[in-house]
Amino acid sequence: MEKINYEEVGLKVGLEIHRQLDTKKLFSPVPSKLSDDVDFTFKRRLRPTMSELGEIDPAALEEFKKGRTYIYEANNELGDLVYMDEEPPRGPDEEALEVALQIAYLLNAKPVDEVYYMRKIVIDGSNVSGFQRTAIIATDGKVETPWGTVGIPTICLEEDAARIIETRDREVIYRIDRLGIPLVEISTTPDIHHPEQAKVVAKFIGDALRATRKVKRGLGTIRQDLNVSIKGGARIEIKGVQELDMIPVIIEREVQRQLNLLKIRDELRKRGVTPEDIKEEFYDVTDIFKDTKSKIIARILKKGGKVLAIKLPKFKGLIGMEIQPGRRLGTEFADRAKKYVPGIFHSDELPNYGITQEEVEKVRKLLELEEEDAFVLVAAQEEIAKKALKEVIIRAREAIIGVPEETRRALPDGNTQYMRPLPGKARMYPETDIPPIRITEEMKRRIKENLPELPQAKVEKYVKEFGIDKSMAQTIVDDERDELFEELIEMGVKPSLAASILAVVLKGLRKEVPIENITEEHIKGAFRLYLEGKIAKEAFEEIFKELAQHPEKTAEEVAQEKGLTLLSEEEVRKIVDEVVNQYIDVIKEKGMGAMGLIMGRVMTKVRGKADGKLVSQIVKEKIREISG
């Protein structure tokens, strides 16, 4: 696709970043950790209620229509009555509130005078109570970027949802260990006008969160959502963007999708089709496929299913049009139908999947299609097939109007997939169990006086004060090893060596061993051995490899087991003598030109057990002695 002029297409992007806080649960003194232990389960059915506006949210209504029962797994340690919705909430947790206020100040926001909790209706089963508690903590923050200022209108403190374990036909199993973990939600204004600008803003916010040292790390602890729109398109909410580097890719692909949907709309209008032309009429074409070679259809017919069809006037050639790499308008139709059937067939992709040209022609004839018309088939039990085709009809009508507002899921390749309609504003009503929380001037002053340093400022300080490479400083800060780095320097380790081990050696081991098993005490233990002259710096890598595999060991135990404790000078001289005697003729011929060869041979014998400088000094002495 040709390069997109984002200013011309009127790109607007807003970010929503959710990050778990590393404190107790928000409304109960239960530890905020995950567990695979299950001691008991309980069931719930959830129903939508009206908001304070007297309206029912469309996304909540769609979930209710699925008619699901929710089963919750819990254990005796984490299965608190608050989060089973059996007793009123306590709190909120003071530490979580203070961390949220720290984040607010780091993002140049103004804390509110009083915190009022609201209930946000959520009935997909992820909240036992059928709602999520959320409150605005601060407003009017901002992030400066090379493209301009991006506002942060709200910073909220809310509860995380239960985690999904299994989805069955009419049942969903959740585990409530994650339910109630404090979650800070940071929303920006839609003042982001370039994909790379979105990445810059997300990184700055991420840096501010990490600076507090009170946010959780690891898979599932951070969720980034995007709101993307273009001129003539629609606001699309994209959920679950995990990686920072994928943000520009996802935005670019969403712009591409909307531009192509607008092209399809324009072509449909040019062909003179209106939403009213797409009738909710289902044609039973089962007889055409009674002897079909299509395994999918044959299997369904054998179970008593049917093949139903709808006609889509003037859609020929457009259902198969690519709107994102590897995704077509037909994919959008299929995504909508997926709540009822695994997939659909459309005329732009047929003959295929065992469906023959002859069968296609028979369907076209039965539906009395004209040259520009298309059709969609669904094979399933009759009522299910009708429900699936109704979803396709809705999406086809939307295609004539343009881009529908939706909540979509980010896919690993940067594309997106339909999840549900965009939630309305009819989701909130006041939380009557939690009184307002006053943010006192004393609390504000105390938090402002103890704000942590932002990561970028720390990187610049390390480069200036310790003279280390900027990329090393960035790695140390990004890996949250900055406090450890400063402790090592206080222990007497040279900054250059500490930086090299933390940013190069440890980083290099990531693909080989689980370095997350290496604790700060392991690292400090290895450096103590080095400072005491017991190991060479070449031994760090071997020690860390072993500690990653066996974290129950100490650095000293590994050094002894692996024979990595330093050789005495006398032992080194003995090894050098052995190698020199082996290559004496080469030394006589080349003199100092044999230095590289001899050093290499000696180091293979003593690596990790002798200081490189000492080895070099002894080898030079020996070569000079022989070559005169």
Swiss-Prot record:
Under Enzyme Commission nomenclature, its number is 6.3.5.-
One Pfam annotation reads GAD
Keywords assigned by UniProt, alphabetized: ATP-binding, Ligase, Nucleotide-binding, Protein biosynthesis
Keyword Protein biosynthesis among record annotations? yes
Question: Can the keyword Nucleotide-binding be found in this entry's annotation?
Answer: yes
Q: Which PROSITE patterns match?
A: GATB
Q: Select a single GO molecular function from the record's annotations and give it.
A: ATP binding
Q: Which SUPFAM superfamilies match?
A: GAD domain-like (SSF55261), GatB/YqeY motif (SSF89095), Glutamine synthetase/guanido kinase (SSF55931)
Enumerate the catalysed reactions: L-glutamyl-tRNA(Gln) + L-glutamine + ATP + H2O = L-glutaminyl-tRNA(Gln) + L-glutamate + ADP + phosphate + H(+)
- What GO cellular component is one of the record's annotations? cytoplasm
Its BP terms in the Gene Ontology are: glutaminyl-tRNAGln biosynthesis via transamidation; translation
Instruction: Check the record and name the InterPro entries matching this protein.
Output: Asn/Gln-tRNA_amidoTrfase_suB/E, Asn/Gln-tRNA_Trfase_suB/E_cat, Asn/Gln_amidotransferase, Asn/Gln_tRNA_amidoTrase-B-like, GAD-like_sf, GAD_dom, GatB_C_1, GatB_Yqey_C_2
Classification via NCBIfam families: gatE_arch, PRK04028.1
| Similarity comment: family membership | Belongs to the GatB/GatE family. GatE subfamily.
Description of how the protein assembles with itself and partners? Heterodimer of GatD and GatE.
Known function: Allows the formation of correctly charged Gln-tRNA(Gln) through the transamidation of misacylated Glu-tRNA(Gln) in organisms which lack glutaminyl-tRNA synthetase. The reaction takes place in the presence of glutamine and ATP through an activated gamma-phospho-Glu-tRNA(Gln). The GatDE system is specific for glutamate and does not act on aspartate.
Entry protein name: Glutamyl-tRNA(Gln) amidotransferase subunit E
Q: Which organism is it from?
A: Pyrococcus furiosus (strain ATCC 43587 / DSM 3638 / JCM 8422 / Vc1)
